[in-house]
Amino acid sequence: RKYCVAPLKQYTDMHDRFLLRLISKKVFLYTEMIATGSLIYGKCFDQLEFNKEEHPVGIQLGGSNVSDLVECSKKCEQFGYDEINLNVGCPSDRVQKGKFGACLMLEPNLVSECLSNMQNSVSIPVSIKCRLGIDDNEDYEFLYNFVSIVKQSGIKVFIIHARNGILKGLSPVSYTH
């Protein structure tokens, strides 16, 4: 796999992915991030839908509770996704309050444990999306240490959002309607 279309909340829905699939048969598509709590409590089933023409398509999960991630991984596999991606890149305040997204880059051992358990619970691939760094932790050593610990989980695919995640203050990119 060479090309992936990054998920973006409120943009990469099934209609967007279908259009992207018409443009390219080679790109790997992802859902927008779905929090484990939303999936467990049934608040997001409209976001889970996809058209069979979208394959290959992965689902992106947000969470940090190992048992919740395992439960959601099993549901996602049953739903027919080709891959599960753990979001360790979203810097939003709301996501941070839920203890997932980019703030998890400060907890590589927890991320590794989550990914290892997710991977052991399903037969489809599990991957990770992370940032180059977060806040002042944006040097090569920070990313190298993070990847070195997380790769012990056995995952094979790291998707790097090639920007630093800003946890304190505004993110440097803003999308307006």
Question: Where do the protein language model's features map onto the residues?
Answer:
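Non-cysteine beta-strand/loop elements that form the S-adenosyl-L-methionine
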Residues: 31, 83-91, 153-162
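Active-site glycine- and acidic-residue-rich loops that bind
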Residues: 131-145
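Active-site beta-loop-alpha junctions enriched in small/polar residues
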Residues: 8-10, 34-36, 62-64, 89-91, ...
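Conserved small/polar residues in nucleotide/adenosyl-binding loops
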Residues: 176-177
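Glycine-rich, positively charged N-terminal anion/phosphate-binding segment
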Residues: 8-82
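Short beta-strand/loop segments at the ligand-binding rim of alpha/beta enzyme cores
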Residues: 56-57, 122-131
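N-terminal amphipathic alpha-helix/helix-capping segment at the start of soluble metabolic enzymes
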Residues: 1-6
